[in-house]
Amino acid sequence: MYTDGGARGNPGPAAVGVLICNEQDEILLEDAELIGETTNNVAEYQALLAGMKRAKDLGATEIACFLDSELVVRQLNGEYKLKNYTLQKLFDEVRKRETNFSGGISYMHLKREEDRIRRADQLVNHALNQALRKAKRL
């Protein structure tokens, strides 16, 4: 599973993108949604949570999560401490949802240039661009 979250303005309008693939790296699901006004780090956590929900809905029992947010990956892998209350609450929600995956869950950082992460980023930007165009028409 590849996820990305982004905010324009940080904080600003934000969206999440989710790309779920099977073991053969075939795309099973692509999705994006607006999540309101927030920061990039909150959007990254929200993207992961959205991906976990969709993976569960698809019947996944084990997932490998690929993110371009080194901060989120290192926090989830216990390498960085959480100092922000909002991120701590999101972190706790991720931990709670991990129990949905009896086969296990892993978190790995990938550079933004990797194809699947780049696609998740495109989904985020497409959702934000559509929202901004719609807002300008109003």
Walk through the language-model features, giving the residues of each.
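Extended, charge-rich low-complexity interaction segments
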Residues: 132-138
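A generic short-segment signal for beta-strand/edge and adjacent turn/coil regions
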Residues: 32-35, 74-77, 135
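RNase H-like nuclease fold core
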Residues: 1-42, 53-57, 61
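Loop-to-helix element that buttresses phosphate recognition and phosphoryl-transfer chemistry
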Residues: 43-47
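RNase H catalytic domain
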Residues: 6-10, 49-123, 128-132
